[in-house]
Amino acid sequence: MPHYLVPQPKTVVDGEGKLKGKLYLADKRFSHLKLFPTRGKIKINFAYDGELFNEYQIEITAKGVSIVGKKDVSIQYALTTLYQLVKQYGNELPCMRIEDAPQNQHRAIQICTGQVCVDYKKEWFQKLIFNMALLKATHLYLYFEMDYPFLCLPHYRRKGQMTQADIKELIALADTYHITVVPCINVLGHCGDFLSYQIHNDFKEYDENTQNPRYSFSSSLCTHSEKVREMVKNMIEEICDLFPSDIIHVGGDEVDLIGKCPNCAPDRGEYGKNGVYLQYFRYINSLLKERGKKMGIWADEVLIMEPECRFWNFRKHECSPDKFKQDMEIVNELRDNTIFYDWFYNGASRLTQEFFHKHGLQFIACSSTFTCYMTSPSLGQGYAEHALYSTAEELGAMGMLTTDWINQIGLHAELGWFPLASGLALNWCGCGEKFCKNHTLDEFLQAYSFQAYGIEDESLIEYLRYAGDFESELLSAFPPQLRGLAIRKMVFSTTNPLTFSMLYSPYLKGDAFNDYKNRVAKLEELFSKIDLKKQDEYFFINKIALICHQALVKRYEKIDLALTEYDKAAKAQPHDKKAFKKGLTVAAKLIRSHKKDLCEAMQFAKRCSLVFGLENSPVLRLEKTLKNIDKLADFILSMKDGHRLLPTFNRIAKFLFSTPENSYWENGSYDWMREHPSYLAFDEDNNPAPAAPIGFASETKYINYP
């Protein structure tokens, strides 16, 4: 039987016999870890050896267990390994010798509490820290964006937000497990939430040539504004006061506007876009350096200036290659006190990593759970992490970070534990040819399934692979853009009960729908086979894919049956009033019957808000969907008086639940303009620029305006 250990130790040598009896840990220095009882039959003995070649070693014989470690954290790592063995074997441990050491010293995950603003749930974060300790993590990055309780911005708070007391308590808890909490804020881009309030309108960047700042919107702060610099200085002072971490991550990624306003434009003309950006972060770095902190910054805006990298290829219109030498002088100033976080979520990124290696810059390679693009996690993301981290190791990265993003519409970080754990396993073990040096991805998945949920078979893995892998039988029938997040959005984001049919019907024609229905039945069967050995109040989130697909099968089936009856009614309308009315009655009844199919989705959405602190919009949208189902049924019944020819479902989807936008007119719009007030609709044009080139004649020639 394989040892289900995550991460897998460097060497495990099995011995003869078993150690029988309940282990206990008498030393109070480690009682706070809550890994072992303080009383039992067999005492866990440990000793320190600062000259030990590895981080720790464990010896289990028929007579007892002994641990040797370099320091306290080494003993903790050994105890977490021993804890996992006891979880698997109980009070009959097989004899063995374990020697272990980490490949990388910076082993991190990021949890996103900003971006749609997740309420703080103390119990979940306590479990998070414990799980991270079991996986031998060193750093927890908390991504606040601007959703942080700044004392300097007392007006900018929200209910449910982490308080400073919450943060202090979490830092203290993490410290007992030798985990450093790193704050992640944004001091330039990704400030759209902050800038959506009129009180902050003067803080934004804008394009002087194309925008009026009184009416324009930007998600970027102005780099030269005195108000911005004073605010950012106060923010950084507060963060430095509260967090012991030697790294403060200040964002800096995906900046939509830089150097376009009157304050910034002169410097952009002289130094270029990159120069304005780098000079601003030179200022930020100076603030942090004064406080003895290192600046963490996302790497994409810096990498734009490198012609070989992917960011340059995508955004070369923003680059100033002629100013590369000048830009690099500032980068070199930042060298000793800055860590560049090089993010890429789809696999290898050798070119960007070579940029940092070539210039002697400190960098951390960042992958992602990728769950924000999915309905269920793809277990194959472990291969993408491996591809990124293996070249990062080769090129001297400080370590690795697996990120979690955008927790909303039924998604929470809890759903991303497999890719979070696989990233930490790769960090500890180091990268082998295909996955970790010490085990394959399949071996990791089986071990983590057991350690996280007590599941000894492959039932959970089979369910998640079927639900989330892009090439699975369940998803491969749909085009890529409709396989991931789109499924989740169809249930928890759209409120139009016809949208799924409009988008997915090309791929569900004929027998294709029955095939999809059978695949969803298989998904249900796979979920039913999951043998959860212990109660876990958070496990329910793994059911999201099944809940979504079941609801969508029912939706498509009932809408399609209703459309069949509606079509019969349309054909009978000119000559058979009885058949006409009957068809509409049956169609409306079928549509209304879909309401009960959304009960489980509604319960799931409410539970996510209660347990994980997710925003409540999925509940609100589902409530509106239920109303729109009634609205659709009522509208169909209102047509029984024959006051107009029946519009197609496509036109109903367009007019009944939203306002169509069109440059001139929307086909069929005249009937909707004369409808009953409950259903009256008309198209609009909120972007009244010409739909085609304009030309007019002068006395001598035609002048064409593009």
Regions picked out by a protein language model, each given a short descriptive name:
Residues 42-43, 64-66, 107, 338-339, ...:
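Structural motif
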Residues 48, 144, 404:
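Short secondary-structure boundary segments
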Residues 2-11, 52-57, 61-296, 364-367, ...:
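Feature activates predominantly on carbohydrate-active enzymes
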Residues 21-68:
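Short, well-ordered secondary-structure micro-motifs within conserved domains or adaptor modules
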Residues 50-51, 117, 348, 373:
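A short acidic, often aromatic-flanked loop/helix-cap motif at beta-alpha or helix-coil junctions
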Residues 2-35, 169-172, 178, 226-237, ...:
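Substrate-binding groove of N-acetylhexosamine-processing glycoside hydrolases
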